């Protein structure tokens, strides 16, 4: 093997590294290595995305039910539906250990202060899913003893329609809640309080899928599956 030795001439021009000709030198290989090994940006943005990812994929529900919709909610925990796919299979019996509560069923006036007290015992961040027509708007019980919608006394994040909704509808509501949590901007500590919290605007699904419903031309009869 033969080698050729070349003497370095410091006065020779160098197009890649011109000394004294340009203030900055462009080296694509060097830039690639810098971007691979050095983070350029705000640490707050990275932490926010990581925290939101952990929150939305580890939602612990509070275990309580009000009426028949609770039966459909518990069906989502069985093997055919497998709510564990979304990280929400850890049912908690204490509101202090739960991340979200599902108002499943008819909310009577005498139960409203109890539900509100349970909600206040939950730690931030916390969310609420209203499941079923009775929880959403009172349903067919337009009487003095039924609250006409749990949003009269609780901040509801997701509404699941139906009487009662199927387990698939509850799972879709859970996915919508995960999507909303992924876009939230809130302080990393619950001690800070409610200031500075940004929640993404979630439009109604009937508005988002309006064109899709209009495009349907083949409507099956009610007795077909």
Curated annotation (Swiss-Prot):
GO biological process: aerobic respiration; electron transport coupled proton transport
Predominant location category: membrane
Reactions catalysed, as given in the entry: a quinone + NADH + 5 H(+)(in) = a quinol + NAD(+) + 4 H(+)(out)
Gene from which the chain derives: nuoB
HAMAP family per record: NDH1_NuoB
Protein name from the UniProt record: NADH-quinone oxidoreductase subunit B
Source species of the chain: Pseudomonas putida (strain ATCC 47054 / DSM 6125 / CFBP 8728 / NCIMB 11950 / KT2440)
Membrane topology recorded in Swiss-Prot or TrEMBL: Peripheral membrane protein
Family of this protein: Belongs to the complex I 20 kDa subunit family.
């Amino acid at each position: 093997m033969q080698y050729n030795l070349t003497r370095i001439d410091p006065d020779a021009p160098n197009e890649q590294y011109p000394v004294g000709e340009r203030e900055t030198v462009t080296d694509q290989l060097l830039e690639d290595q810098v971007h691979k090994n050095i983070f350029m940006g705000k640490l707050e943005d990275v932490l926010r995305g990581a925290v939101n990812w952990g929150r939305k994929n580890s939602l612990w529900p509070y275990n309580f039910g009000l009426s028949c919709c609770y039966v459909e909610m518990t069906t989502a925990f069985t093997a055919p539906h497998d709510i564990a796919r979304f990280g929400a299979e850890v049912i908690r019996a204490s509101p202090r250990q739960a991340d979200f509560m599902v108002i499943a069923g008819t909310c009577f006036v005498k139960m409203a202060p109890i539900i509100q007290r349970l909600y206040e015992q939950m730690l931030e961040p916390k969310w609420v899913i209203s499941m079923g027509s009775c929880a959403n708007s009172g349903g067919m019980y337009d009487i003095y003893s039924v609250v006409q919608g749990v949003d009269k006394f609780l901040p509801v994040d997701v509404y699941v329609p139906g009487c009662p909704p199927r387990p698939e509808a509850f799972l879709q509501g859970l996915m919508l809640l995960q999507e909303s949590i992924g876009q939230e901007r809130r302080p990393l500590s619950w001690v800070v309080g409610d200031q500075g919290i940004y929640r993404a605007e979630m439009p109604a699904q009937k508005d988002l899928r309006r064109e899709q419903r209009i495009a349907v031309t083949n409507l099956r009869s009610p007795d077909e599956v």
